[in-house]
Structures are given as C-alpha cells and as structure tokens.
C-alpha cells in the first residue's frame, strides 16, 4: 500500500502542477525528475521543518497556495527553517554524545534535558538509536513538564 502511495505521489510531483511543490523543487535546485531520495531527504524535511520550529501551517500553506509570490516566500522560509532544524539537531546530538557515559550495558537509553527543542528530539532519538543499537527515549523538560519522544 505504501509503495502505491509513493508511486502515485511521485507521478503528481513529476507533473509539477502543484505550485508549492514546483517552487520547492526550484528552491532545492532539483532539475531532474524527483525520486524517492528527493522526497525523503530534500522535499519532505523542508515541508516538515516549519512544524518542527513552530510554524506548523507553513507546509500546508505551501502545498495549498496558488500565489507564486507567497509560494516562493513560504518555500524560502521552509528552506531556512530546515537549516535551523539541522543546526539544532546537530547541536543537541553533540551535546548528548559529549555528556553520555558508557551505556553499553543498559537495554534502553532514557535521557532528559532542560529545554531541549521538542521539535527535534524524535530525530535525535532516532540518531542515537542507530548509534547505540537500542531503544532511546529523550525527554525535554520545561518547568515541571516533560515531553518525550522515542
């Protein structure tokens, strides 16, 4: 079923009829027919980046928009948010790795930190899972509230 969705989605994207997708393809400098790689590593992260840094509606507005000027503005902002997300992700991952003791005997890693950006802790948890080959739960603590992602 997922393959069918991806195949159909690629057909739609290749047609370049959606102004937002077309604009994002231009911003990403994708000049060939988009592939699964482009979806997973270039387009998808940018569309999701707004939600990760607090601008939840940007991705949807880009995909639904009909105005070239506002589509370009949204695509440019999403591209910038994606760069910010990458920096936040890299910084948090490095911070955790620098502070992490030897967890080789622990079956699960459960780590928490004050004010870790909740939009990226899931991505960082996935990176740590790959590095340590075990389940990882990260908890961002703000005041007396914790938000977790695994």
Regions found by a protein language model. Name each.
Residues 1-150:
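Hydrophobic helix-and-loop "lid/oligomerization" segment in the mid-to-C-terminal part
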